[in-house]
Amino acid sequence: MSHSRKVSVTGLGYVGLPVAVAFARQGDVIGYDHDPQRVAQLRAGEDRTGEIELAELRQNTLRFTDRAADLRQGDFHIVTVPTPIDQANVPDLQPLLSAAATLGKHGLKRGDIVVFESTVYPGLTEEECVPAMEKESGLACGSDFAIGYSPERINPGDRTHRLDSVRKVIAASDAKTL
């Protein structure tokens, strides 16, 4: 039995936008960013990161939105928000935890898969992100939805080693999800 999943990508920066564009080559993708200005720029065919060409932004299978409720249309969610570090090299997890809570509240349904690509330390996905999604959705990881992790492999500005030419490492909560 085959299942065609609809992808949503949360965070349309230098990591998320290339990921959304790559998946849109294969099917419908919802590109979500909480910043209305960023979404308006992308809809106008402008990419401030310089990672994506105009023609790729205009794929008719890629839809940009700043409405969190639109995440509900997806069933395979990829979270690619930044985890900036401060002067002491401590990561600011607020963008990631906020994205996890938003996805839990507005997008997560039974049978969904969530893959995190944000740079995080070991254990963070299961210890922090999953509880945030469970709290907001009322669902349980493992029985209602599954998670995965695939560290970002994008080097901004590198035109040689693009997303489609670099091997990805992936992990998942169970063999079926993998």
Name the predicted role of every residue range.
Residues 1-178:
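Structural/interface elements that position substrates and couple domains in central-metabolism enzymes
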